[in-house]
């Protein structure tokens, strides 16, 4: 796996699924391929994106700044600086300085990532802030190692929290989660459908599923009533794809 592919993988792992994630993936691909060279416009676009947490925006801004060639004196962006200040905690800053000194001795991406993984997310963000604010310089490869270590830690905690939700025994949370997944699957089907005759059929199925979820939420239904909802919808999607001659693995 190439270095930039690895960076893209780690960075996208902390972006919530949805149309915005697809858009960010496209931007990253363009930047890494050298197709997008307007850092100013890119940062303005990033700043106004909804849904993303300030830290995720800060990390993306840091990656764009590292990889898009720009004039030396280009202004640093406040939204990135604020996100990478380790919540203003002096302990984070102290640890960030120690980490920075260690990173100065590293020359490889993986070496930097290994060193960084033993620090807290706050210290890692502060260290990125040091580099972003030009208070310290490391090679691009080492800086990207730091980015990936930070993303790995964030993705780990997101995964733990997601697993807790998926394995929860609380029937109300499970019920709501199934309805949310059904609704987002239906939305994805509508976006994929296009305009052929079969597409109208897929749209109809998706629309019915969303109406059903709406009705269930309005009336208030028994927590077990949502069991299998998403799977039924995915089976319909699978059948639709087969008729369209598209053979894809299940989304489950």
Swiss-Prot record:
Record-linked SUPFAM superfamilies: Influenza virus matrix protein M1 (SSF48145)
Pfam families assigned: Flu_M1 (PF00598), Flu_M1_C (PF08289)
Family that this chain belongs to: Belongs to the influenza viruses Matrix protein M1 family.
InterPro entries: Flu_matrix_M1 (IPR036039), Flu_matrix_M1_C (IPR013188), Flu_matrix_M1_N (IPR001561), Flu_matrix_M1_N_sub1 (IPR015423), Flu_matrix_M1_N_sub2 (IPR015799), INFV_M1 (IPR037533)
Encoding gene per record: M
GO MF term set: RNA binding; structural constituent of virion
Region (RNP-binding) location: 165-252
Record Gene3D superfamilies: 1.10.10.180, 1.20.91.10
Cell compartments where the protein resides: Virion membrane; Host nucleus
Membrane topology field: Peripheral membrane protein
Entry's Gene Ontology cellular component terms: host cell nucleus; membrane; virion membrane
Descriptive protein name: Matrix protein 1
UniProt keyword list: Host nucleus, Membrane, RNA-binding, Viral matrix protein, Virion
